[in-house]
Amino acid sequence: MEKSKCPEVRFKHFNESWNQQTLGDMFLPLSNNTLSRADLNYDNGQIKNIHYGDILVKYAAVLDCRNDKIPFITDGEISDFKNQFLQNGDVIFADTAEDKTVGKAIEISAVDDNYIVSGLHTMAYRPKIKLSPYYLGHYLNSNAYHHQLLSLMQGIKVLSVSRTNLAKTIIKYPSSVTEQTQIGNYFQNLDQSIALHEKKLSQTQNLKKAMLEKMFPNVGSTQPEIRLKGFNGDWVNSQLSNFISIKHGFAFDGAYFSEIETNLCLLTPGNFMIGGGFKAEKFIYYNGEVPENYILQENDLLVTMTDLSKESDTLGLPALLPLIRGKTLLHNQRLGLISFDNDELDKGFLFYLLQTESYHKYIVLSATGTTVKHTSPNKILAFVCDVPEFEEQKAIGQFFKQLDKTLVLQQQQLQTLKNLKQAFLEKMFV
């Protein structure tokens, strides 16, 4: 048994060397079409069309024609495409992309209608030999196959691979159809589990978004649409300036910024998540002297003052700082540190109030700048909001804190599955 022709991880009872052929010898190229998105619709038609974009956006390696949403060709006639219809087991490549996803492929599964492929950047193939369902789709998305494409890519900003070069790549597969089946089913089950976890995460994200709208009063109302049990009465209209102050960050000297990781981390708007919240990445490391009153503490509440995105995705939004062992977080410029002037406003309640759509809309509309948007402490403090009694504030903060814990757990579970898939994509193919 040749080690180079066998995967590192293998199902029991299989020990034969894998077969290999060039893609050009193993596949027949299929006809392509030059239809654009303008020729398609999602409502009705006789023929469905798989486009370049349908390949790049799909995480899974198999396109399930029963469940994936594929558009129709507007006014498409069967007689015009009858020799081009796809079959189960056909594969489609995206031959260009702005990153190394060029060469991403999907396998067609569960064909229940008339499907064709179109687009200048798609290449469709049909295997000349019968392979087990799901095997090809996952093999073609493995590192074992994709590393062959790296030396064949052309271009600088936009990468591409030609049909001629694609034909030179080597396809490897077990001689045993049973082994092919077990590999294909294993990855297909992983993809289905990932899809279910993504759906669950999306549902929780949508629930939080809906509750942020319904558990805070609408403009002109003194009570929210949805209220926690045991609370009643009107909320009091007030400005944030009646409860809090906001301190600007320090302009740390760029001469002491470090490309080498240190324990001193300057926070930037890049550490804020879209919608609000903290992310421990994109730190700027620092190795200079630090003013003591610009060292941040666990559970400090900060807001962003600057945003570079077109939609001002994080402008004015909050983050509560976690404890990051071995790191000291520094209060950098372009961030505001919130302090509480009295005991009338709960920090948890304020954290989620600053994530509401009405607050963010106010901040964006009052922002200055074109390419770079800016807000200020005064503008944030001038925000007019409705505030309930302190006990209800705490209860609302706890409700959303539990939702966020659920979101973090679901994100971790999803990432674990994706990491597992990536690990086995490297170890179960050659």
Regions found by a protein language model. Name each.
Residues M1-N15, K199-G233, Q412-V430:
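Short amphipathic coiled-coil heptad-repeat segments
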Residues Y186-N206:
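Hydrophobic, ordered structural segments
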Residues G184-Q188, G397-K401, K405:
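Acidic/polar-enriched heptad-repeat coiled-coil alpha-helices
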Residues E8-T34, R227-F250:
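Non-catalytic DNA-recognition/assembly elements of restriction-modification systems
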Residues T222, S238, L330:
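Short, charge-patterned binding micro-sites
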